[in-house]
Amino acid sequence: MAESNADVYASFGVNNAVMTGSTPTEHEQNMLSLDVAARDGDDAIVLSDEPTSHNDDPYAAGVDPFADGEDDEGRIQVRISEDGNEAGFDTDGDNSEVETEGEDVEFEPLGDTPEELSQVTEQLGQHEEGFQAMVEQAVERGLSADSVSRIYEEYEADGISEKSYAELEAAGYSRAFVDSYISGQEALVDQYVNQVVAFAGGQERFSAIHTHLEATNPAAAESLESAMMNRDLATVKAIINLAGESYTKKFGKPANRSVTKRATPVKPVARQKEGFTNQAEMIKAMSDPRYRSDSAYRQMVEQKVIDSSF
């Protein structure tokens, strides 16, 4: 029995379901006459109008095409604009505050005393000597020793009393003259304190160091205050340097520690205090070249300054 055309096509995997004619030529003509989308076995191709504008931003629709739709674990999606700058960010999940560590604090040892500080210190001393000379001259004019003691106490405290004003005026010093003199002295004191604070690194740094001393070494804090009142700049600098180093160790850069070593607490040992016997010995130690170049020597000297009792 001769094979039909259908049998021939069937041997190549073609059945009657896809044949629209009795011959291949007739089938091709019938298929070409159909609408493109209706051709059997073809994929439908749909053409759309050209968009009026083109946007390369895959996030323009407000949806992250790369995000996992089921991810709800508080991830952050950041959008970058075409010019490379961050355009905005969206956060999912609960808002949480992120704590960051502050910048490392490292104290730089104080160097040479600024010329401005030295000058105002000298002016302050001269001004006080002038006040003492004025009081001594008032004594020669009849001011009593008790009045002199009282005036000094008032001068160092809250100001001259009315009684002292009257006694000074009787000795030849008017109220306006006394007030002017005291105002000048107070201005110099303010200038002196501001210069010391600036020398220490500014108000914030000075306050931090002073507070640190009050908490860890109250005696050193009192020594610093006393040295400032006495205009002892060498002692002021030594105490601030020592306190600054201690402050850095406590609040500054963390010490590098090998991960292979276990931190073992060391049993504290009481330190034996050894101060300078007099100011001349202290100045000699600070004049040593090692004070500027050897940190261990400088720390030893500064510690002896704090331990000194003179």
From Swiss-Prot:
Acidic residues composition bias: residue spans: 83-102
This protein's UniProt keywords: Viral capsid assembly, Viral release from host cell
GO BP: viral capsid assembly
Top-level taxon of origin: Viruses
InterPro entries for this protein: Gp9-like (IPR008768)
Disordered: annotated segments: 46-102
Pfam families: Phage_T7_Capsid
Family: Belongs to the T7likevirus capsid assembly scaffolding protein family.
Name listed for the protein in its UniProt record: Capsid assembly scaffolding protein
Top-level taxonomy: Viruses, Duplodnaviria, Heunggongvirae, Uroviricota, Caudoviricetes
